[in-house]
Amino acid sequence: MFNEITKSVTWNGKVLELSTGKIARQADGSVTVKMGNSVLLCTAVVANTAKEGIGFFPLTINYREMAYAVGKIPGGFFKREGKASEREVLVSRLIDRPIRPLFHPAFVNETHVTCTVLSYDPETPVDILAIIGASAALALSPAPYLEIVAASKVGLINGEFVLNPTLELLKTSQLDLVVAGTTESVMMVESEAHLLSEAQMLEAVKFGFESFQPVVKIIKELAEEAKRPKLEMQDLYPSVLKNEIEQLFAKEIEQAFAIKSKQERSTSLDLISEKVITHFISNIENKKYNNYQIESALKSVESDILRKEILEKNKRIDGRSTMDIRQIACEVGLLPSAHGSALFTRGETQSLVSSTLGTSLDEQIVDNLEGEYKERFMLNYIFPPYSVNEAMPMKAPSRREVGHGKLAWRAINPILPNKVQFPYSIRVVAETTESNGSSSMATVCGSSLALMQTGIPIKAPVAGIAMGLVKEGKKFAVLSDILGDEDYFGDMDFKVAGTSEGITALQMDIKISGVDFKIMKVALEQARLGRLHILEQMNKVISKPNSELSKNAPSTTTIKIDKDKIRDIIGPGGKIIKEICETSGAKIDISDDGTVSVYAADRDKLKIASDKIKAIAIEPEIGEIFNGTVTKILDSGAFINYLGNKDGFVHISEISEERIDTVSSVIKQGDIVKVKLIGFDNKGKAKLTIKNADKDKSLNNPKPQNSINNAKENSEHVRCDSIKKRAWNEDNNAETAEFITERKYFN
């Protein structure tokens, strides 16, 4: 019944298996990918007719993760998979980027590729398997897919490159890099790095490129054995048409490209396009050339003119040389009510960035195949139509916006303080207010400025730059800080972000084959010089984080308690924690490991809540002195309430240095007295003394008052001080971290 074809290879100690002919046989191309316990179904479907006049290749990639792949039922009311998650969008783009440039330029048939995770194994990189499966499915389809793509993931652990590291290994890796390409060249790179050098990044790309070559081989073998026919393609346009356009309109196009303003240049080129179409209108009526052929030939002429100016004259559209960076302007603090804000402008590209601090309750909950976790750093990239002067409605975030936001997130994330150092959640929103090349890198620069203005203790300022490439034969030019037109007509989009010390993110998309590691090395070094120049301009405005947080930011602290004390803070039915929140106005979040995060609108409310928590959860030590309230008088002594909710007993012999006949002759119910903890009886009850404590000069000696509230305030204040002293004297990382946090941000 099935005519199944299977190819396999042992890859990094695991068997990678590709098979076709059993599942989804009616699809033009269908491949099942297996590695470990991961199983993916990748299909490709090609429309029978071309979509004439569309102006671009209508390729759609959909990556889907099914809940049953890990034995789960989806949450929500409908209990089924809904719209694509952020991860699904990002992996879809990861598949699209190395594949899209490899189709015949005249191919405009609707093409859909779907990659579905049927079974998930956390020990295998399913995003890499999806790229491999999509490439194999297209190789089996009738689409004119000109070269075979494969991919690999690279980590860096203890100075050694690791192929396809597991999720657990990635937690300790200095690098998370995906590289895809053919047998000849790299086509795509996506990475997050922890301040690695250009040489290390280049070696990582080489390592990944060499590692996936056996996979390219088995995809080719699978396609050759399946022997599926391919669509025959004609030239995109007749060469005679291009020659005629070049002869008639080349001078006008050159003059248009000499205009520095994007809007004026675009208007001039649009007018030329109308003239070209009008000139050939008679041929359109005779059906000699169609509109799409004319527009395609015109774009080719424009590309040739732009590229020739760069390669032969070292002259770019706006008059810059290949290494020049556009003029930069930076401003911070322009939004008074925001926690932090910045405006970063580079030429005609501009990003307005704001940063907001929140609590752990504001963290993004992410639920995917790996399980549920929280993300404390969120970065939203917004690209409104007005940024390119287009009259279009605002819509939900596009795939492009999600992808650009994630790239900026990767660039910023490595330089953020950890949660112990800075217990806030952070949201950055970057509005692209103008765009003419590399708005994602403007987002990186603006985000760094806004975070520093907010007072977030980032490790170092970060800047980003987009590089381009023009290559003809062996001659090439690498372009720094590319414009939109240079991106469109060029051969590479190469984005690098990092500090003065190293790279934090690298993204590369190549449109042609033959880009070797020599060119990549030149591009990386040129990007480093450009990045340092941009950082220099940014540092003139703000070079390090503000010492204090914005007055609009919430106050927060973190307290580490014993896990057994969690129930005491919560109380029966949440009574205690609710009372603390209501009386202090603070928010409290308790983790299972005993980490208590407290958030409040101001420092006073924060102190009230945190002191109450410490009073409940932290046990007093023998020898410590507290202010307490007399709650009951007996013949043998008195009960004292201290440290919030704790009670102890003072024997009559411990009340005064002198002999007394009755307790009530010295103290009365409601009095505030100074007590020292001297031990515990056999039932665990605290034994206190007044006579020794009264001589202690380390505390203020308040006059007795009949105020329980004042007694609690004084008691809590004393307790807080003693904790801080102990934090410095004991080898206790949690308490030390807590004290440093309070001292840095709230004292």
Swiss-Prot record:
Annotated stretches, region: Disordered: 694-716
Enzyme Commission code(s) on record: 2.7.7.8
Domain KH: 554-613
Skewed-composition ranges (Polar residues): 699-712
Domain of life: Bacteria
GO cellular component: cytosol
Catalyzed reactions per annotation: RNA(n+1) + phosphate = RNA(n) + a ribonucleoside 5'-diphosphate
Pfam families referenced in this protein's UniProt entry, alphabetically: KH_1, PNPase, RNase_PH, RNase_PH_C, S1
Cross-referenced CDD domains: KH-I_PNPase (cd02393), RNase_PH_PNPase_2 (cd11364)
InterPro entries: ExoRNase_PH_dom1 (IPR001247), ExoRNase_PH_dom2 (IPR015847), ExoRNase_PH_dom2_sf (IPR036345), KH_dom (IPR004087), KH_dom_type_1 (IPR004088), KH_dom_type_1_sf (IPR036612), NA-bd_OB-fold (IPR012340), PNPase (IPR012162)
GO biological processes: mRNA catabolic process; RNA processing
Enzyme class: transferase
Biological role stated in the UniProt entry: Involved in mRNA degradation. Catalyzes the phosphorolysis of single-stranded polyribonucleotides processively in the 3'- to 5'-direction.
Protein name: Polyribonucleotide nucleotidyltransferase
Gene name in the database record: pnp
